[in-house]
Amino acid sequence: FRLCCAHFNHCIRGEAAREDENFVRAFCEKHALKLLSEKADVPAYANENSLSTETAARQLRYDFLERARIQSGMGFIATAHHLSDNAESILLHFFRGSGLNGLCGMKYCSGKIIHPLLEFEKKELVEYLLQNGEQFQTDETNFVPDTARNLLRLKIIPEIQNGINSSCEKVICRNAKLLNEDEKYLNGVAKEAYLNAKTENGVDTEK
């Protein structure tokens, strides 16, 4: 299969963000990979549109990734989200009352976006890179408990791992898979019921 790398500079972390971009460029040159890159002032965009920085960053990032996908002629956008990311997202959805869909977690394929690393914990990916002599960048903002996700990552999940279940991230994601099957079944039942009740004039609520 063909690969094209894409890097988006959110202009949030100053010099550290520029170092990340330079790292990606060097990596792509080393491995002869095509790179498309772009940067945008996420804080300014967030302020102009009354969005949280996290929401603004996601919007601009995925808008860019879709443009990059089309420009490069690629079929899909592959992100590096892993099992630990998924567990955090599931817990965030749980505490926000997102319902069944949110508790299902990230899907391996959602439209043109794929998540090929969802089966791997972060520590497994780091170990793989170290064993193969590959360098990597670390986002220092991940270690500051100033967001809900960072609070989960730095304090809540470690407490659960230490006091209840050291494999809690895997358990959370395994439960999400089971809930995903439940959701598929319920959606199928609902669709069948709708088709059975559908009439030329609308829906027969007695069926």
Each predicted region: which residue ranges?
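Core alpha/beta nucleotide-donor-binding catalytic domains of modification enzymes
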Residues: 1-157
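ATP/NTP-dependent adenylation/nucleotidyl-transfer catalytic domains that generate, transfer
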Residues: 147-207
